[in-house]
Curated annotation (Swiss-Prot):
Subunit architecture: Homodimer.
NCBIfam families: ilvD, PRK00911.1
Encoding gene (name): ilvD
Family annotation (Gene3D superfamilies): IlvD/EDD C-terminal domain-like
Protein name listed in UniProt: Dihydroxy-acid dehydratase
Claim: Iron-sulfur is one of the keywords in the record: yes
Amino acid sequence: MISDNARAGMQQAPARSLFNALGFTPEEMKKPMVGIVSSFNEIVPGHMNIDKIVEAVKLGVAEAGGVPVVFPAIAVCDGIAMGHVGMKYSLVTRDLIADSTECMAIAHQFDALVMVPNCDKNVPGLLMAAARLNLPTVFVSGGPMLAGHVKGRKRSLSSMFEAVGSYAAGTMTEDDVCEYENKVCPTCGSCSGMYTANSMNCLTEALGMGLRGNGTIPAVYSERIRLAKHAGMAVMDMYNKGIKARDIITKDAIMNALTVDMALGCSTNSMLHLPAIAHEIGFDFDISFANPISERTPNLCHLAPAGPTYMEDLNEAGGVWAVMKELADIGLLNTDCMTVTGKTVGENIKNAVNRDPEVIRPVDNPYSKTGGLAVLKGNLAPDGSVVKRSAVVDEMMVHEGPARVFDCEEDAIAAIKGGKIVEGDVVVIRYEGPKGGPGMREMLNPTSAIAGMGLGSSVALITDGRFSGASRGASIGHVSPEAAVGGPIALVEEGDIIKIDIPNMKLELDVSDEVLAERKAKWQPREPKVTTGYLKRYAALVTSGNRGAILALPGEQNA
């Protein structure tokens, strides 16, 4: 056992005295020590129930012959951090979570791990740690929130953000907004649509790192407690069989996850996190991989914000495995990949059933013949940009309009709510990238304001920042290279014509190469927005959005 390094032999007698202080018995010190990574806190609705999940995991581990030991991971609520300086501190926690989990696991010589995440950066951060540490590892999330109900219709947090925009447009009263405020988030859990947290929890299943239902069983269901017990048992089965994280997180598994991503219509943030997870196993994931997969993968689900269904509906329809069965039946998945069940993907999903063909469309009747995401390139984004095309209305799939340029999110929001943005405009928000932000803030407030003002079918938004999974419309993010390093987005001027062609994966600035060269010669880097603390170090180490905003030493950032 790895844990013998910390517990066995005369040399470790001092360590055993400390285990005695923890209450360990001699019998327990002879059993595998399983770290339970708990992201419980009392500030994130998706994490307030995780203490109960952790207790269930502990019972499962002990039942199967292991000794469970809990240690913490941090988690930020993106909804609470949204629209102010706090959003600079969201994406950056992903790497803190990965690094701190690595430190705890190796310092204390755990034999296996159960990760208990739920929200946006917590899930990919722990997936990165799992791949890096390569121990027997199982994931069990806290689960999604139930949808709210307003005036007889299901609603969620994205509805709340758009209600604020509608109030600014004069189409909602303060009482209307208050009703949304009190009803859209009725339970604990990760917000109820196919936003980033639920996207990543579903993709954890697709990767093979979570048991069936990990991404979809609602947080308040007792079924999730049973799932957590089974996760504890499963990690001991993996330990006994010698199955480790990198036996599961492989290149083929990551490509499976990307395929499922397209079918589900996941958050654009998956195009930051999958490259980062891939990096941990030495797989150079190019975001352009998304396009050929998207071209052959039908979009089968239109969960909020793309449509009127929610995670509870996907769960009732058969969940992620039912979606995977649809894809496997037409040869789009590698079904030989290993999973935490000790079985292959094919063995797991062979009896999965699609119980609701409106929530999960059959492959012969998809919402669209192409997947939910697209990577756009052109002279405005030479290294790529990302759009959730499953949430773009038909009339905005091809668009041309004048640039309305803003150097920060706040200025753009003021212009949108002030009525200064009109039909046909292309809002450009720059210097919000990984380095420029720093921290690559989500632009949910601007996109929600555009939708709430009634401009969602006529105005596009382009940024070197990123978007919440709750954003919809022609929202094109992760523009790379970013403005802070002199990318073409830094050279856009007010009124320049921008051409968007999502079907052909093009994003072009209608300005000649000669003019762009003249502008580039005059361009000067901006002074850093943050000069102290973690964000200063992060800005120095972070790479571009097209590389997953992974951290690298300065000499390796363009590798």
